């Protein structure tokens, strides 16, 4: 019995020690955006690979359309705050001209726009927001 408990404890520790820490230090700011895709300012989101900047969030939000299935999985939204420099003036992420990466203007660290994964392990994780899509309206929230 004691051996079984010890083995289960080791398995539990092993599973949870391998998890990546996806938490960010970016301060919490309530986000509750509603985008109508038919509006001209949101036209880039009507096609795969399109993106728009929003003024909400901590340093702004980038919304990217990664698929065209007609559901919430089509979109991804991140705060534009750099995880490493969010409290500095240069700590705002911008989409690079190739439309593939977000880059920090402080140190040039990059994240894939399609999923927010860092190009380098030490870059940190982006603050992602929940997206819900239906009837031509995209909701972006963090609550």
Language-model features, listed with the residues they occupy:
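Sec-dependent bacterial lipoprotein signal peptides
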Residues: 1-18
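Generic hydrophobic-segment detector
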Residues: 4-7, 39-40, 106
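N-terminal pre-ligand scaffold of iron-sulfur
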Residues: 20-98, 112, 127-143
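Short cysteine/histidine-rich metal-coordination sites, predominantly Zn2+-binding motifs
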Residues: 96-106, 118-131
């Amino acid at each position: 019995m004691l051996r079984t408990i010890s083995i289960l404890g080791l398995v539990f520790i092993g599973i949870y020690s391998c998890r990546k820490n996806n938490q960010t230090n970016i301060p919490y700011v309530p986000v509750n955006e509603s985008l109508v895709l038919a509006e001209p300012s949101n036209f880039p989101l009507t096609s795969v690979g399109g993106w728009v900047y929003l003024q909400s969030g901590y340093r702004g939000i980038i919304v990217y359309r990664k698929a065209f299935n007609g559901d919430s999985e089509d979109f991804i939204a991140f705060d534009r705050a750099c995880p490493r420099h969010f409290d500095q003036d240069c700590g705002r992420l911008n989409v690079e001209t190739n439309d593939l990466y977000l880059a920090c203007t402080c140190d040039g660290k990059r994240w894939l726009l399609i999923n927010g994964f860092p190009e380098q392990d030490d870059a940190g994780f982006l603050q992602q927001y929940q997206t819900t899509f239906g009837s031509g309206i995209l909701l972006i929230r963090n609550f």
